[in-house]
């Protein structure tokens, strides 16, 4: 089984850049964001990120990566709580946004199209595990 939780990804506010991991900065209209957290507040791991990244590559969808600084608490998703009760591989993805949860929330129109295309490709894919091997079959 596979899961695709899809919360939004807050972009660092100009005055709060200290909260993001150095060198990782998603951009609006830069593609779908794969979210990582060293304290496991997101479900993404190396395998799920690699599989989802390959699905996106085959679908022509750009991918960005984001990680919170592990020493500063940030948001989380329900995905990691759900995965604790059901054995499925999951990857947390979203769209880069400014002013999340405000009346002026802003995201890119291209990113919305990218996420739709990524979700279509994900649900049209067959991900098979055989021991340590993973086989990915996607519709052409």
Identify the meaning behind each predicted range:
Residues 4, 8-102, 130:
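Active-site-adjacent substrate-binding region
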Residues 95-140:
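His/Asp/Glu-rich mid-to-C-terminal helical/loop segments that flank catalytic regions of hydrolases
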